[in-house]
Amino acid sequence: MASPCAPYSRAGRGVGSPSGAPKRTGGVPDVLPENAPEFLRRYYDYYKTSRGYHARSLNSTDGFTVVSRLALINTPILAYAGEIEHGVMIVHGEKAHSRYFGESAFKLLKGDNKELVIVPGADHTDLYDGGGKNAIPFDRIEAFYRKNLK
């Protein structure tokens, strides 16, 4: 059975050479649709404004190449989470669309040197720069580092 990624792999491989530019997935849209989901609105507010725009940011521009993430598709990134002996802190905004992933990952961790921090009122991008509301819990991060990174 052929991989569902095969068409993208063939379409993107080798492109970017003198024959042409690589195909892209698309970043955050330049014009936000009226019915855009809340997480896309938050990304737009960050990546498409002076708050987070950068000409080389993949989310501010035209996104990743269609083949750049293929190597991660079958990577079991949490398969050995329960074997981590060192301190782990997971920080998510209360309103982050990705919060479920951090909470799921936290449940796999063992030991008493793990901490899950849910920042009240914060969304995903608020934790990039504070979101104008001091959302980054620097005091908690510092305390965790001092306790666990000796």
Describe each PLM feature range.
Residues 120-150:
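Catalytic active-site module of serine/aspartate enzymes centered on a nucleophile-bearing elbow/loop
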Residues 62-80, 86:
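Active-site nucleophile elbow and catalytic-triad environment of alpha/beta-hydrolase enzymes
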Residues 84, 90-92:
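Short beta-strand/loop motif that positions the catalytic acidic residue
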Residues 48-67:
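Flexible internal linker/loop segments at domain or repeat junctions
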Residues 109-125:
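Catalytic histidine neighborhood in serine/cysteine hydrolases
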Residues 1-49:
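Alpha/beta-hydrolase-fold enzymes
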